[in-house]
Amino acid sequence: MDNLELMKQEISNLAKEKKEEFEKVSDYIFANPELAFKEYKSQEALCKLLESHGFVVKRGIAEMPTSFEAVFDSGKPGKTVALMGEYDCLPEIGHGCGHNLIGTSAAGAGIVLKEVMEKHEIGGVLKVLGTPAEEKGSGKAIMVRHGVFEGIDAALLMHPCDESMPDDISFAAITLEFTFKGKPAHAAACPWKGANALSGVQLMFHAVDMMRLHFKDYSRVHGIITEGGVAHNTITDEAKAVFNIRSLEYDYMMEMVDAIRDCAKGAAIATRTEVEERQVDEVVKDVRNDKKLVQYVRKNMDFIGEEYIERDLTQGIGSTDVGN
């Protein structure tokens, strides 16, 4: 083995030695699932783990109480690398996406790398970033806006899956709420006096369905009616729908957004209602991984004997705030 391979083996051995310690934290987070922006127990478990291994930890960065930044500064020149951890859960399901593993893997990798950096006097700054609200709220996008990632040369995250892959593909995504406002009236006695907001919502859905044919492959639009009225014998004066719009490219997604907006405006005109739009959560952009880093991941997977497949469009695609 050359020096690099010896160091990789040392890292692998250290990770195995500390496996039980890391598993306890992961199991604790799994057993205490917390929704976006409410991950107080998970945050504290990860922060205490990192502090116990000498990281300087700051809680509540970027105006998010459940975020954190853990730093090891070698005091020597070098790159700044961030390992990103997630730890929020899904409503009702819990940790169905394995965020207990993501948060713990980031902290665990940071602890192991810090020990190796100290032993071999490797320069640079190592950060572990606690990024809340990936499932709803896009905490990383908020952190980008607050400058948390400025000065970072590389940011990495591991996501569990049923197959190992060194690269990833994701949709850019935006969620919009459309509120249609009409005029109430009795649906039997004098419906002509009203303007039906629910009709506006229904017509918008039909218009969006007509547009699907014209969107590029690997684009998605899916929506639900969140408010449709309170009584069947009255003309609904307010109705709401939420649409999620996705595409492989952020710029094309925004073209789709313009088309969806036209569907809403046209539906409002046709039903003599009015429509208002509100963006829900942060926009998430498509992931564009650095190909050199991807190749390093491949080599490291080969080194430890990890079997993997290459990512492609047939495997199912989701969205994540990592792309921001």
Ranges and model annotations:
Residues 2-124:
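Acidic/His- and Gly-rich active-site-bordering loop/insert found
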Residues 4, 8-11, 15-22, 39, ...:
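Generic structural signal for well-ordered, non-membrane alpha-helical segments
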Residues 8, 12, 32, 36, ...:
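Active-site oxyanion-binding pockets that recognize sulfate/phosphate
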Residues 29, 143, 243:
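Residue-level signal for inorganic ion chemistry
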Residues 62-63, 160, 281, 314:
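Residue-level "edge-of-site" marker
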Residues 66-71, 88-96, 100-101, 107-109, ...:
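Histidine/acidic-residue-rich, glycine-tolerant segments that coordinate divalent metal ions
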Residues 202-324:
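Metal-dependent amide/peptide-bond hydrolase catalytic core
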